[in-house]
Amino acid sequence: VGYLPSSLVPLLLLLFVFQSPQDTLQKHSQAAESQRRAGNAAGAENEYRVVLTEGYGKLGKVYAAEKKYQEAISALESARLYGPESEELLIDLAIAYFDAEQYEKALEPSSKALAAKPQSAGAHQMRGKSYFMLGDFDKAAAELQAALKITPNDNDIAYTLGLAYLKQHQLPPAQQIYGRMLAQLGDRPQLHIVFGRAYRETGFLAEAIEEFKKAVAIDSNFPRAHYYLGLTYLLKDGASRLPDAEHEFKIELNSNPGEFFANYYLGIVYLMDRKWEPAIGFLQKAILIQPANPDPYFHLGQAYQATEKYTEAIEVLRKSVALNPSLGHNDYQVATAHYRLGQSLLKAGQNEAGQKELQIAADLKSKSLQRDKEKNEVYLNAANLQEANRKFPELNSSEGMIAESKSPGAGVAEELRAGEAYYSGMIAKAHNELGLLRADSGDFKMAAEQFALAAKSNSQLEGLNFNWGLAAFKAELYKEATSPLERELSAHPENVQAKELLGLSYFILENYHRTSQLLSDVIAVRQSNVGVYYTLAVSLIKEGNQARANQVIEQMVTIGGNTPQLHILLGQAYNEQGETDKALEELRAAVSLDSKLPMVHYYSGLVYMKVGKFDEATKEFETELLLNPDNVQAQYNLGFVLLAQQKTAAGIKVMGDVIQIKPDFADAYYELGKAQVQKGEIKDGVFNLEMAARLAPDKSYVQYQLGRAYLAAGRKAEGESHLEISRQLKEKERQQTKP
């Protein structure tokens, strides 16, 4: 059975999107839960992946029907990640890219579908429509011919193939196709309207008129039929057909008084006939129907000017200017609108405002002349229609006829919203369960990724934010952990474990103020975890709140007794107060209790570095790295000390290793670049100092060294510029440190 082009039929998507309330997604989800309960994690994961493949595929269909094309693309691309790429999925993706006007990208999935199934009518059709929009009508026709051969009764394909023939100026084969469609579907007015539009938009105006006449002969009251006929009279023969056009527009309005275009164009016909009052009436009616359209305001302004109603002209012309979408709209209508507005203001005695509008009109006219030149060049030289239409939408005509679609009605829209919620919920649940399975296996990074994907579909899923934050924390993704944990606390402020995880994350991120807030709440409820006291005390010391830190240390002593962590903490406290001998004494006490304790040698190295004992600092950092090779800060400080001792080659090597491990370590780039410049390796030094400046643009010392490096490289202007930036940043720093 044949069917009409997509722009003419109601939305049928729901027939296959909502197969039943308990569709296959529920079955696979239940099967996954059964596998998980049986201890078969791999089987459960496979079932959840099926849920994601089907769920994303159906969600993509819903988004496409809602005209949310980018969301549709995202959903359908996600479906490709979790299961086999079915023909249906690939064609749906091609359609989504096509509807989003990404015609080049639409070719990839349709071509892939065709490679897997050469007899895929849908793949041939989407390739044909995409080539059509890209302006390659030969390829478009070839693909559409292949599609029509496979499904000879598909009238959507036939109609588009007819358009491709018309674009190739091949009238007879297009007429033959449209004749077959008439024989198949019956002699209906809507078919003649569609054919007439195709002929009109491809320049076959006489044929278009004949089709519109056939439409009105079958049904004189068919919506827009007389309007299309009247408009095509004007397009073909101009002012000589004004009476005929007027006659057709009046007939249209008798049957469809609320038809915008009939009111609008009848108003224009009366303008051209200098019949001002009826022109004003019809244009006012058009404005009531489409109050956000700038065009009837523009022409109404002309009628008011002609009748010397300048106050009214000023009002509607200002409205036309305000609503105008672009310079190129309606042959630079906005430039003329400013000109007419200027004239009306002058007539109304508003000379200054009038002159201003006339100047704007002159400027826009100049731009329009340049744009005309560019438009001609684009029209002649553009690689495809998409490029031309993107730069100059006013060049677009028949292309829109194969890309247009109608919005769903209210009832369908409500069902689509329900479908969106349903599939999003199923997808979120599947991602959440996959995250839990990955966490159970110890793959916390992948677990965090799955929880993040679940949140995209349903951020309100119970327990999701905590699971995501915990997985990110265990994967050492501390920055990523903070957002879901903050949301968890916002919803459940009583969750002490979330507070502890969030506080520890902020500590690692060096946000000591937030750490102190959170962990103070934690120790008020959980008083037995010495590690939390330790972290809180360090944060308070870093904040400069020594009195409160001492209180926490006393509580820590009461709970934990004489522990190595206590001595490390006391060592840090003494170091912050400048009592370096006492700090080293406490750190040695920690080593005596546990010589392999992480961080104790690192903190000892910092104290030795502070007092200028670089040999001792080097030994401490090296010892720390033997115990804890992943301590990037220890490695950085080792490199710093080596460079300070003029052990340049060794220091450069260590700093290079630091950057390999942590590519966003600004100070490592800074020290490495500075050392390279001093060594005479100017090019490498400039590169690393540029990286430092990119990562830490507000550091005066970085800008200073980069400026000096540019000068050394002979780049005087850049060098002086960065030295000036450094000076400004130093001044800003001084202002901020003033009491």
What residue spans do the PLM features occupy?
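Structural signature of tandem alpha-helical TPR/SEL1-like repeats
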Residues: 37-43, 66-78, 100-112, 133-146, ...
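Alpha-helical segment of the N-proximal tetratricopeptide repeat
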Residues: 24-50, 54-65, 163, 390-408, ...
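Structural marker of alpha-solenoid helical repeat scaffolds
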Residues: 54, 82, 116, 150, ...
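TPR/TPR-like (Sel1-like) alpha-helical repeat modules
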Residues: 318-322, 335, 339-369, 690, ...
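TPR-adjacent "capping" and linker segments in tetratricopeptide-repeat scaffold/adaptor proteins
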Residues: 18-27, 48-52, 326-331, 375-381, ...
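Helix-start (N-cap) detector for alpha-helical repeat units in TPR-like alpha-solenoids
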Residues: 25, 53, 87-88, 121-122, ...
